[in-house]
């Protein structure tokens, strides 16, 4: 799907499973943004199937859900197109990044009370949160610069972090696949009940 200006995304269906039972059987419908290879997170549950890997695993149910993958993908492309044209201010973007980064210091009221995010960045609870700082810096230096102050830019900053950022601790890097899955879940949870859901 081409969202314009060569911004192309392709359908991706991923399957995860573990032989030791630590993960359930999981099928995800998503996309890859070709320009940056970000894994794009679908925000609704229609795009995934999850079940414990037991004798009762119902693959027919999984197949029925996956049969709708193209329709879900097409709808998601329409949503992304809307996000490209929907402005988002720095305070709102920063508040969403703070939810993803689990920075409890930032609440809607505090984030909106600051008209300049630069002042928020001086707060110790904020600048110590490496995830929040990485999200914000990537947004400002890359996504906002190239895509404008839009929901699409905010979304792409989050998917960049989920896809490309190293683990915070070097000892956790060997488990980066599980970390990336957890990051995608954090994005889904963080954007619920925000402007992203309203525009979807």
Regions flagged by a language model, labelled:
Residues 3-200:
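Intrinsically disordered, low-complexity regions enriched in serine/threonine
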């Amino acid at each position: 799907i081409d969202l314009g200006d060569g911004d192309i995304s392709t359908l991706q269906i991923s399957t995860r499973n573990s032989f030791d039972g630590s993960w359930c059987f999981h099928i995800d419908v998503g996309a890859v943004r070709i320009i940056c290879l970000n894994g794009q997170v679908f925000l609704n549950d229609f795009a995934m199937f999850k079940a414990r890997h037991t004798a009762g695993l119902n693959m027919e149910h999984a197949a029925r859900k996956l049969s709708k993958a193209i329709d879900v993908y097409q709808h998601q492309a329409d949503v992304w197109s809307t996000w490209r044209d929907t402005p988002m201010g720095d305070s709102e973007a920063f508040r969403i990044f703070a939810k993803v980064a689990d920075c409890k210091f930032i609440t809607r009221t505090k984030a909106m009370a600051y008209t300049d995010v630069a002042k928020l960045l001086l707060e110790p609870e904020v600048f110590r949160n490496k995830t929040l700082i990485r999200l914000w810096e990537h947004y400002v230096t890359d996504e906002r610069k190239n895509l404008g102050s839009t929901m699409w830019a905010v979304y792409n900053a989050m998917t960049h972090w989920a896809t490309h950022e190293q683990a915070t601790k070097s000892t956790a890097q060997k488990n980066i696949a599980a970390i990336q899955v957890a990051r995608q879940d954090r994005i889904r949870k963080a954007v619920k009940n925000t402007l992203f859901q309203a525009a979807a």
